[in-house]
Amino acid sequence: MGLGYPGGPKVDKAAKEGKKVSIISVGWDPGMFSLNRLYANAILPDGKDYTFWGKGVSQGHSDAVRRIEGVKDCRQYTIPVEKAVEAVRSGSNPELTTREKHTRECFVVAEKGADLAKIENEIKTMPNYFSDYDTTVHFITEEELKRDHNRLPHGGFVLRSGKTGWNKENHHIIEYSLKLDSNPEFTSSIIVAYARAAYKMNQEG
């Protein structure tokens, strides 16, 4: 499964040689959102896909900030831009840049004596993580981080905006959303469900 991903063919080859069922990319994105995009494209072939993540903690982006010199800890929130979401829901099929779809907000605990201006600049200019987004950086205490940012919520939604009719006169929106109190717990629940399915499929030959 998942042969479209770079590692897919190798996983598939190993599974076939071992006479097992392989699974990859079975979280929620890639994973559940991927399945939603697949069936939405089949139902509305004349349309566009849109994906928004958040509001929630991005563990990868938080870790990227922690690697900056002078940073003790961080929580980074990915936030959908409401104006962009509403534009998609309206059926206008907008062309949206990365910056227009999401903002990023960082709550950073700095080491004592660290150069805060340097840290903020490094965050905002970090390629592949923050440079393409409008990013806000807040410096807070370790106590504030533990009190106000001690959970790992996340979520997001996938929309397919499409048209039908002889003159494309009818507009449709398919929207699938997740609102998660605990991203790790929800993701592990998906993986366990897929593991059960893989085991059953393997047992059935």
Question: How should these model regions be labeled?
Answer:
Residues 42-43, 47-54, 105-110:
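Short beta-strand and adjoining strand-loop segment in the mid-core
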Residues 12, 32-48, 63-73, 197:
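Oxidoreductase and adenylate-handling cofactor-binding alpha/beta cores
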Residues 19-41, 191:
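Short alpha-helices
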Residues 197-205:
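C-terminal helix-rich "cap/oligomerization" subdomain common to oxidoreductases
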